[in-house]
Amino acid sequence: MLAGLAGALAAAAPAFAQERAGEPAADGNIVVTGRPEAPPTAREITRQARSITAQSGLRESPLPRFEDRLCPGIIGMKADYASLMIDRIRANAERLDMWLTEDDGRCTPNFIVAFVRDGQAELAALEDEKGYLFRSLPLHERRELLAEDGPVRVWTTTQTKTRDGIPVQRGQGGNPPTASMWMAHSKIYVGTREDIVSVVVLFDMADAQGKTLLQLADYATMRGLARTRPTEDGQALDSILALFDADGSPPLQMTDFDRAYLAAVYDDIPNIPGITKVQGVNRQLRLQAQAEAGAPATRE
């Protein structure tokens, strides 16, 4: 199903010609290749996972994630293309064993992908007219969102809850109370979790031109299902977060690293310190490799 869906999405937007591997050079010259690069180390993978995580205080705070049913919706795109993007986002969520609404078009979207002429102007106008919608954002996040001048803006609303799902009110300073405790398996858990209530991913239409529906859906998935950010520094592993990099060739879809990152975020219970999730990307990559090789998964 996933392979067929990926093919349909790729066919619905610009395609890129590729040379066939192994085809001899036209002039018959001998091609000399160097030694393959060594695979990235566990430390490099963890460093990359940390760099794309849009959050500080990872040793004390959990990473935000969806705990309620997910309902993706698209604004500003033709219905048939929007349907393909929604199918892809839902398929990505299914791979993470996320809780999804029925795919009948009747749910109220809590994951909105919108294509607009000027995302910064849209948000500024919305703040002027309905500023109360931004009250749940800490002041520094609100300022960063409204000042963002890149091709994509991500507006994530979260709710701090106890580990059992009871809402926790923020203090006067905007920071939720935190607590640590010992639980089973000799792991340290935190007393609260951070639930994503809703996400709006705004693409500037001019910058989205030339990208495939598959790339756009996977980029939105990577930015919306977790609080991530693109980085300008060179990375050890490819990522769909490089989709709008001015230099280089972005991947055609989510990479193994991307899937491992999201799998780590949605692995186990939600009230685990973020640093544990970040370090878990290495484990998820190993599990992926074992699955591709047909080897039985080993307990770690």
Indicate residue ranges for each PLM-predicted region:
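Long, folded non-catalytic interaction modules
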Residues: G73-R88, D97-E300
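Compositionally biased P/S/T/G-rich terminal and signal peptide-adjacent segments
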Residues: P39-F66
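Acidic/histidine-rich, surface-exposed loop or edge segments in extracytoplasmic proteins
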Residues: G28-I30, P62-M77
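Extracytoplasmic/secreted envelope proteins and their assembly/folding machinery
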Residues: A42, T46-A49, A82-R90
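N-terminal signal peptide c-region/cleavage motif recognized by signal peptidases
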Residues: A12-P14
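Bacterial N-terminal signal peptides that target proteins for export
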Residues: M1-L5
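N-terminal secretion/transport leader regions
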Residues: D27-A38
